[in-house]
UniProtKB/Swiss-Prot annotation:
Main location: cytoplasm
Functional description taken from the UniProt entry: Cell wall formation. Catalyzes the addition of glutamate to the nucleotide precursor UDP-N-acetylmuramoyl-L-alanine (UMA).
Name of the gene encoding the protein in the UniProt record: murD
Originating species: Buchnera aphidicola subsp. Acyrthosiphon pisum (strain Tuc7)
Top-rank EC class of the record's enzyme: ligase
Lineage: Bacteria, Pseudomonadati, Pseudomonadota, Gammaproteobacteria, Enterobacterales
Binding site for ATP: 113-119
Alphabetized GO MF terms: ATP binding; UDP-N-acetylmuramoylalanine-D-glutamate ligase activity
Name the UniProt record assigns to this protein: UDP-N-acetylmuramoylalanine--D-glutamate ligase
Length: 440
């Protein structure tokens, strides 16, 4: 289907990387959109072309209700009253992913989930390129999809957040994957977790091949499931599964052994699942199995994702700053094997999530919890006997450096958004690395 944007009043919401990519997309088509940002001083303001009309400081602007088409950046909630009013007036509101999907003719692999998206998307990009594809990776991983549009591409790998899926309606994926679904971004969704889950599930609606995590008990009745192929991973009854009868779990497809985890650099069940689903995607794309296995054997963790920064004098320091929800902290704790004390750095903006699921884990572990940031005091009350409140990350690391002993593991796995004290999780992780080098 061909879309004609000429003669339409087009408005872009947000001056982040996504917003800038949308401006450039329309300018290449000879169309001048307008743009609004909620901030009075957006960091990317200098990137706005001089001939583009803009408004700063608030979304409550007449341009919204005068528009024919609004392209909304993922950081802006779709549930703002003025946007609800715009929809009621019949104004079309879409994401940059929707714009992208209208332009692409080659296969798309869409990857979403609460945790693990960037890791799996990067694995698949490497496997695809090794298999001879001209593959491009973009989306939530940090490169807007409109920036990777290429007429010579023969495959796109797209990492998708729930925010990006909210206003995406015509994404026709060759393969769609939901890695996992657990509580996150509850403060974004008026109807809570089920609304967040349903948004994630929408990635399957127009997909050809749907890869599902059997542990999440996906309700297929909620998905437009006509003419779809379903592939499962996770449990013992899944197509792709992990056999854990030995010290080194083995990855299987059906009853056939694929890979022994002793042969790979990554460790922890969350990483074994990431490799498992990458194998499922690779097989569905008919990438040569040997290419996939060779890439996965040599793959190491991405920065800020259970990244071992230092292992000296019997003490391991692990940077898992990408942990921005409860489930990711739970997974990180379950991946640690130590005879000493786990010293967990937990805190930031909890996004109204329920952290009580960590109670039982804390009770069974030899652990000391250092709670910091905006919700640090609240988090310290989950397991008061093992917790201490510290104002910020720096003070927490200084305190830990005085208490740590040989055999201990220091884990930054905050389980929270970083935006209360940092620009993003990368800045938080980089500070942690800097402090380790300076203090320990």
């Amino acid at each position: 289907m061909s879309y004609n944007y000429f003669g339409k009043k087009i408005l872009i919401l947000g001056m982040g990387l996504t917003g800038i990519s949308c401006i450039n997309f329309f300018l290449k088509k000879g169309i001048k959109p307008k743009i609004i940002d909620e901030s009075k001083h957006p960091s990317n303001f200098i990137k706005i072309p001089q001939n583009i009309e803009y408004s700063l400081g608030s979304l409550d602007h007449q341009w919204i209700l005068e528009s024919d088409l609004i392209v909304i950046s993922p950081g802006i909630s779709s549930f703002k009253p003025i946007l609800i009013k715009a929809r009621l007036l019949g104004i079309e509101i879409i994401s940059d992913i929707e714009l992208f999907s209208r332009e692409v003719t080659c296969p798309i692999i869409s990857i979403t989930g609460t945790n693990g998206k960037s890791t799996v998307a990067t694995m698949i990009e490497k496997i695809a390129k090794k298999s001879g594809y001209k593959a491009f990776l973009g989306g939530n991983i940090g490169v807007p999809v409109l920036e990777i549009l290429d007429k010579e591409a023969d495959l796109y790998i797209i990492e998708l957040s729930s925010f990006q899926l909210e206003n995406t309606f015509n994404l026709k994926s060759k393969i769609a994957v939901i890695l996992n679904i657990s509580e996150d971004h509850i403060n974004r969704y008026p109807n809570g977790f089920q609304q967040y889950k349903n948004t994630k599930l929408s990635v399957y609606n127009q997909a050809e091949i749907c890869i599902i995590n059997s542990n999440d008990k996906i309700e297929k009745s909620l998905i437009h499931s006509k003419n779809k192929k379903w592939i499962s991973f996770g449990t013992n009854r899944s197509d792709y599964r992990i056999c854990s009868k030995s010290n080194d779990p083995i990855l299987f497809f059906k009853n056939k052994k694929i890979l022994n985890t002793s042969e790979i650099l990554l460790y922890g069940y969350h990483n074994y699942n990431n490799i498992l689903v990458s194998l499922a995607i690779s097989d569905a794309m008919q990438f040569p199995r040997n290419d996939a296995i060779n890439v996965l054997k040599s793959f190491s963790n991405l920065p800020h994702r259970f990244q071992i920064i230092k292992n000296e004098k019997g003490v391991r320091w692990i940077n898992d700053s990408k942990s921005t929800n409860v489930n990711s902290t739970q997974v990180a704790l379950n991946s640690i094997k130590t005879t000493g004390t786990i010293r967990l750095l937990l805190g930031g903006d909890s996004k109204s999530a329920n952290f009580n699921i960590l109670k039982n884990i804390f009770r069974t572990l030899k652990i000391k919890i250092y709670c910091f940031g905006r919700d640090g005091i609240k988090l310290s009350k989950i397991c008061e006997k093992k917790s201490i409140y510290v104002e910020n990350l720096k003070k927490a690391v200084i305190l830990i450096s005085k208490q740590v002993k040989s055999g201990d593991t220091v884990l930054l796995s905050p389980g929270c958004s970083s935006l209360d004290q940092f620009s993003n999780f990368e800045e938080r992780g980089n500070l942690f690395i800097k402090l380790i080098k300076e203090i320990t």
